[in-house]
Design a protein with these regions (language model features):
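Conserved short alpha-helical segments that host acidic/polar catalytic motifs at enzyme active sites
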Residues: 1-289, 295-358, 362-363
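Gly/Ser/Thr-rich loops at beta-strand to alpha-helix junctions
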Residues: 152-154, 361-369, 460-464
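Short secondary-structure boundary/capping segments
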Residues: 163, 251-253, 261-262, 373-380, ...
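Catalytic or ion-translocation cores adjacent to nucleophile or general acid/base/metal-coordination motifs
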Residues: 171-173, 178, 220, 384, ...
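Phosphate/ATP-binding catalytic cores across multiple sugar-kinase/actin-like superfamilies
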Residues: 228-231, 334-355, 373-376, 426-449
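Terminal amphipathic helices with adjacent charged low-complexity linkers/tails
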Residues: 300-316, 361-397
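Short, glycine/charge-rich flexible loops or terminal/linker lids adjacent to PRPP-binding catalytic cores
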Residues: 375-452, 464
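PRPP/pyrophosphate-binding module of the type I phosphoribosyltransferase fold
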Residues: 432-490
Length: 490
C-alpha cells in the first residue's frame, strides 16, 4: 500500500471594491487580510508543516512594491505570518491605521488580492524554500507570478525534461518550482505576444503596458501548460498586474470551492470554511469542476472556463473520510453513514451482547462516524424492544417492561487526546515515543473483565498510534475484549 500523504489547503480572495469601501462598511481596510486569516485558520487541519501568503496591490506607481509575500515553518506558521504582516502597522497612529488611501499608497500587504497556503509535504522535502506561495519576479508587472497549490503530480520527471529541452535551467528539482517555471514561461510568451501586437498597432510606452494588462488572458497560458500535468491538483495563481486564477485537475482528485458576490470572490479547498468566513448559503457556493478554471481579471470580471476535458471521476475518497472538516453538510452525512454500516459486523463481533458492551471513538475526526454508528445501534435496539414486546403473548409484567425500556446503547468517552501531534509525519524512535503519549483514557468508563470495549476510528492512518499507544492504554481499563473498527476501509 502506498504511504499516506496528506493534502494541503489553499485560499484565495479577490476584493471587488476599493479598500475605502471596506473601511467604511466593516471598520477596517484589512477586511481581505482578516478574511484570509480566517480561511487559513479554519483549514489548519490541512497543513501544520508551514504556511504562507501573498498579496498584490493593484494601485501602485513605478518604483513602488506591489507584490508581497510572507512564509513560515511549523505548526504556528499561520500566527507567525500574520504577526509579521501586522508588525508593519505597529507604529501607525489610529488615524493612519484607518486611512484606506494612506494604506493603499504606503503600507505593505494593503492590497486587493490575497492568496494563502497551508502545507503538508507529499515529497518529504522540508524547509522554508519549499513553503508556498512561490514567486517569479520580473520588471514587467504582467510577468510577475505567484503560485500555490494542493497537488501531487506523477510525471514531474517528464515535465522537467520538457522545460529543460526548451533551454530553461530550473534552480531546484521540485514539483512546485517546475510548475512555476512552466507557467511562468508561457506567461512570458503571452505578454510578449501582446507586446508585439500592441507595437504593430502603434502603441508606445505605458500605453503598451496598460493594453497588455487589459488584454492578457490566462486561459491561453493554462491551455498550453496544464494538459501535460498528470495527477491531482488545485493550483492558484496571481500575477503582478492583477489577474488571479485557480484550476482543478480533470479527474477531480483535489477539491476546490468558490463564491462570489458584489464585494468579493473567494476560493478555498473546503466549502464550510467559506460559509463560516462569509456566511453565504451553501447553495451559493460552487464547486470548481474537474478540468475547470476560475479567472478574475484586473477589472474584477469573473468567469469560469473548461481548460481540460473532464475525465473519469477519481475524487480522493480520503478527502471526504479524513482530511476535510466534518462540518461540510455532505461530508457530515457520508461519515455518519460509514458509522452506520458497521452495526451488523459489530453485532456479530460482540455476539449481540449489547448489555455488556461500551462504545467509544478515537478523537477527534472519528466522532462523526461514531454518531452514525450510535444511530444505527439505536435503530437495532428499537427493533429488538419491539420484538420483545410482541412476543410476550400473556402481557408484560412491570418488571419485564422496566427491563425492556431500560435497554440502551452504552457509550463513553473512553479515549482522550491530550496533545495535538501527528505521529505519522515523525520517524523512527521519535515516532514511537510520540505515539505513546498522544492518547489517554477515562478510568472507570468500562466494567473491568466484564464489558466489551468497541472503539471506532475513521481510517487506518493511525496504524502506528494504534499499535504504540491506543491498544496498550485501552488495555489498562481491563475490558473483556477490545474491538477496534475502522469506518473506512471496512
Amino acid at each position: 500500500m502506498e504511504e499516506l500523504k496528506h493534502e494541503c489547503g489553499v485560499a484565495m480572495i479577490r476584493l471587488l471594491k476599493p479598500l475605502e469601501y471596506y473601511e467604511k462598511k466593516y471598520g477596517t481596510w484589512m477586511y481581505g487580510l482578516n478574511k484570509l486569516y480566517l480561511l487559513m485558520e479554519k483549514q489548519h487541519n490541512r497543513g501544520q508543516e508551514g504556511a504562507g501568503l501573498a498579496c498584490v496591490k493593484l494601485q501602485a506607481n513605478p518604483g513602488e512594491e506591489y507584490m508581497f509575500r510572507e512564509r513560515a515553518l511549523g505548526t504556528s506558521a499561520i500566527t507567525e505570518i500574520f504577526e509579521a504582516v501586522h508588525s508593519n502597522y505597529a507604529s501607525l497612529t489610529e488615524t493612519q491605521l484607518h486611512n484606506a488611501e494612506y494604506a493603499e499608497q504606503v503600507l505593505p500587504f494593503a492590497g486587493e488580492i490575497y492568496m494563502g497556503h497551508l502545507r503538508y509535504s507529499t515529497t518529504g522535502k522540508s524547509g522554508i524554500s519549499y513553503i508556498h506561495p512561490f514567486l517569479r519576479r520580473n520588471n514587467w508587472r504582467a510577468k510577475n507570478l505567484s503560485l500555490c497549490g494542493n497537488f501531487n503530480l506523477t510525471n514531474v520527471d517528464e515535465i522537467f525534461e520538457k522545460i529543460t529541452a526548451k533551454g530553461q535551467h530550473p534552480r531546484k528539482y521540485a514539483d512546485t518550482y517546475i510548475m512555476l517555471e512552466e507557467v511562468g514561461h508561457r506567461l512570458d510568451r503571452e505578454v510578449e505576444r501582446l507586446y508585439a501586437k500592441c507595437e504593430n498597432e502603434g502603441l508606445e510606452g505605458m500605453d503598451i503596458t496598460y493594453a497588455i494588462e487589459d488584454q492578457i488572458d490566462l486561459a491561453n497560458v493554462l491551455k498550453k501548460t496544464t494538459p501535460g500535468w498528470d495527477g491531482g491538483y488545485v493550483i492558484c495563481g496571481i500575477t503582478g498586474s492583477g489577474e488571479c486564477f485557480s484550476i482543478r485537475d480533470p479527474w477531480g482528485i483535489r477539491p476546490a470551492f468558490w463564491y462570489a458576490d458584489d464585494e468579493v470572490v473567494v476560493l478555498a479547498s473546503e466549502r464550510p470554511v467559506i460559509q463560516t468566513a462569509f456566511n453565504p448559503s451553501s447553495n451559493s457556493i460552487k464547486e470548481l469542476l474537474p478540468g475547470q478554471a476560475l479567472f478574475v481579471n484586473k477589472k474584477g470580471n469573473i468567469r469560469t472556463e473548461q481548460i481540460n476535458l473532464p475525465k473519469n471521476n477519481n475524487a480522493c475518497s480520503f478527502e471526504r473520510i479524513y482530511f476535510s472538516r466534518g462540518s461540510d453538510k455532505d461530508i457530515y452525512q457520508e461519515r455518519k453513514q460509514l458509522g452506520k454500516n458497521l452495526v451488523k459486523p459489530l453485532l456479530d463481533a460482540i455476539k449481540n451482547d449489547i448489555d455488556h458492551t461500551v462504545f467509544s471513538f478515537i478523537p477527534n475526526t472519528a466522532e462523526v462516524a461514531f454518531y452514525g454508528m450510535l444511530e444505527g445501534f439505536e435503530v437495532y435496539l428499537n427493533q429488538l424492544k419491539k420484538r420483545y414486546l410482541t412476543t410476550l403473548k400473556n402481557g408484560v409484567s412491570e418488571q419485564e417492561l422496566e427491563h425492556i425500556l431500560s435497554m440502551r446503547i452504552r457509550f463513553e468517552k473512553a479515549v482522550i487526546k491530550d496533545i495535538k501531534l501527528r505521529t505519522f509525519i515523525a520517524e523512527g524512535n521519535t515516532r514511537n515515543d510520540l505515539a505513546a503519549h498522544v492518547y489517554d483514557i477515562t478510568y472507570g468508563s468500562v466494567e473491568p473483565y466484564s464489558d466489551n470495549l468497541v472503539v471506532i476510528d475513521d481510517s487506518i492512518v493511525r496504524g502506528t498510534t494504534l499499535k504504540q499507544s491506543i491498544i496498550g492504554i485501552l488495555d489498562r481499563l481491563h475490558p473483556k475484549k477490545i474491538i477496534i473498527v475502522s469506518s473506512s476501509p471496512q
